[in-house]
Structures are given as C-alpha cells and as structure tokens.
C-alpha cells in the first residue's frame, strides 16, 4: 500500500503529522504501508513555482492512494489564477480522474451541543453527500472574462455534463445507498437549468438498475433549506459539482465542527485522494491548535475505500469515538467540563486509544 502524503499549506503539515502517527501504529501491527511526501498547492509554488509540480504528479500517479492536508492561504491570493494553490487541487483531481467526492456528515453523540441546531434536530445525524467532481460549471468551456460587442466587460462560465459523467456518479451513489439505508436523494435545479433536467432524467434511468433503492428528487434551494430544517430525512444525497460544493459545506456545519469531517475523492477503480473537509486555516497555522480528527478519519476512509481494510478503518474510527467519549477536545469543539488538548495532544490520545 503506497501512500502519497501531501501536507500542503497552513495547518496541513500539523494535521497530516497526526494522521501519519495513526498509520504508523497500523504499520507496526503488520499493515504493509509505505509513505512518501511531496508538496502541493502553495508549498509547491514556493518550491517549484507551480502548484502541482512534476515530482508530485509522478508520485500521485504511482501511489495507490493520496492523503492530503489542506491547500491555500491569503499569501497566494494575488497570484495569477493558474498558479494559485487551489488550482493544484483541481489539477490533481483531474490528473487522477477523480470524479466521485464522498463527504460524510456525522454527528458524534458527544458533540451534540457543538451544533448550532437544537440537539434533537441533529441527534443521530449520518448523511453521505456524493458530489460529482470533474464536470459542471467549474470545468465547462467556454469560460472567461472578455469585452463584448458593446465594448462592455462581461464574464461567463458554462454549465455542462455529458451522459457518461452523470451515469458513473449515479452508479457510485446508488452503490453507496445499497450499503446504507437504501435511500437516495438526487439534488438538481431541473425547473430552471437544462443541465440538471438532463441529470434528473439519467438518475431516473439508472434507478431502474437498483429497484431496492428509493430515489427522490429535490431542488437545490429546497435541499439547502431542508438540511437545516430536518436533516435526518436524508441518508445519501447525490448532486453535481457546484451544488455539491455548497451543500457539503452546509451539511458539515450541522455537525458543529468542520474539523471533524473527512472526505474521499475516488476514480473508477477506488484509487482515491483523501483530505479533511476544512481548509488550511492560516490564522492558526503553526500554533498546534488545529483539530486533526478530520484528517485521521480521512485516513480511515482511505483504508476502507482504496485498500479494502475494513477492520483497520474501524479501529481508527473507534479510537476517535473513544477519545471523544473520554472528553478530549481541540479548541474548535471544546466545551466546559472537557479537557482541551492541542493538535499533537489529540494525536497522542488517538494513538493511545488504538
């Protein structure tokens, strides 16, 4: 199991270090894990002048999975767009043909008070959002900023999906629904956008291959509202790139801390890029304050989806549950009566729990 470790920017190196400690425990206990580091994002720009350099490309392609910290930061905001850290993330997703983004939103019982919603609204919350990653308005051509025939500046982007792109993400979502509670909600804006009307048609066609799964449809504006009003009605949600980007961030905050939430981006063969759902948090970088649990749980997702190591994945997840039950909290999830720990302190607790 060769893993490319890309610490990235901001708090990335700190949180990745704790995930590596967890992998080291598993390696000591017999899992054949091999790791190698490379830069991505701002760190890569600082070193190579580009956010996704050739050395990183080579390692990412050769590895069986990629574990990433976070990319970005205000220091890079003035760079030309192709050189910005986020472009490195888009490029590696494209390069590795990662088309399915899985974002779980799980509320741990111990953190029920961390959510801004009433505990009874979010108790037992466990949603999986499946987001298509390589199509839609983020990648559609033409795009740009230009001067029109009236001599006025204008900007334009193109929302576009091919049938094969929608079909393959549909199969991923239905497959996940089959392993869970057999409920799938497809989110679109079919009343206004032809692209998502097309999306809905294909979802209905693919559903015929999964008669055990109950498929429902919801407009994106209503879905955003329902996630706050009654989130427990959802089990698996599937949607396009831009809607998924927004809804998965919204769902993450139902849980009280984005610092708790992992994510996976998979290709056709379950090779994946695994990263926490949060950003690089430059305001707390280097202070040993970050919450490493999302990154540790991303490593657990990697063990499950890319390596089929279900027992190892559960061992990591159970260790996280145990440290929360023991009352350990980083600053972002701290509440009175708990024990506040640093980033490395949380790593210590998880390793001890394993």
Curated annotation (Swiss-Prot):
Site for Important for catalysis, residues: 138, 189
Main subcellular localisation: cytoplasm
Ligand binding (NAD(+)): 73-86, 279-291
Pfam families named in the record: Iso_dh (PF00180)
Residues annotated as binding Mg(2+): 221, 245, 249
Catalytic activity: (2R,3S)-3-isopropylmalate + NAD(+) = 4-methyl-2-oxopentanoate + CO2 + NADH
Record's cofactor remark: Binds 1 Mg(2+) or Mn(2+) ion per subunit.
NCBIfam families: leuB (TIGR00169)
Name of this protein: 3-isopropylmalate dehydrogenase
């Amino acid at each position: 199991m060769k893993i490319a470790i890309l610490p990235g920017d901001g708090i990335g190196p700190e949180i990745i270090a704790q995930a590596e400690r967890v992998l080291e425990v598993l390696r000591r206990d017999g899992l054949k894990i091999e790791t190698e580091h490379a830069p991505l994002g701002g760190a890569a720009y600082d070193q190579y002048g580009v956010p996704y350099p050739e050395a990183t490309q080579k390692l990412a392609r050769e590895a069986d999975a990629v574990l990433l910290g976070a990319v970005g930061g205000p220091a890079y905001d003035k760079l030309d767009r192709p050189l910005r850290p986020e472009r490195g993330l888009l490029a590696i997703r494209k390069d590795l043909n990662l088309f399915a983004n899985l974002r779980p939103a799980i509320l741990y019982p111990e953190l029920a008070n961390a959510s801004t919603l009433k505990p009874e609204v979010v108790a037992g919350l466990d949603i999986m959002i499946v987001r298509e990653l390589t199509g839609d308005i983020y990648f559609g051509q033409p795009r740009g900023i230009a001067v029109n025939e009236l001599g006025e500046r204008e900007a334009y982007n193109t929302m576009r999906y091919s049938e094969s792109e929608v079909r393959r993400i549909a199969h991923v979502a239905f497959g996940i629904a089959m392993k869970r509670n057999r409920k799938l909600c497809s989110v679109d804006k079919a009343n206004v956008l032809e692209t998502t009307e097309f999306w809905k048609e294909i979802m209905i066609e693919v559903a015929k291959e999964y008669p055990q799964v109950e498929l429902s449809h919801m407009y994106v504006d209503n879905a955003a509202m329902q996630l706050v009003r009654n989130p427990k009605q959802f089990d698996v949600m599937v949607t396009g790139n831009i809607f998924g980007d927004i809804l998965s961030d919204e769902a993450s905050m139902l849980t009280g801390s984005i610092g708790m939430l992992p994510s996976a981006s998979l290709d056709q063969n379950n090779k994946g890029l695994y990263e926490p759902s949060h950003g690089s948090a430059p305001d707390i970088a280097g202070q040993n304050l970050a919450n490493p649990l999302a990154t540790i749980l991303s490593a657990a997702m990697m063990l499950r989806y890319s390596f089929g190591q279900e027992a190892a994945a559960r061992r990591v997840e159970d260790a996280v549950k145990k440290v929360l039950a023991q009352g350990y909290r980083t600053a972002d999830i701290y509440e009175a009566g708990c024990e506040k720990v640093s980033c490395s302190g949380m790593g210590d607790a998880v390793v001890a729990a394993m």
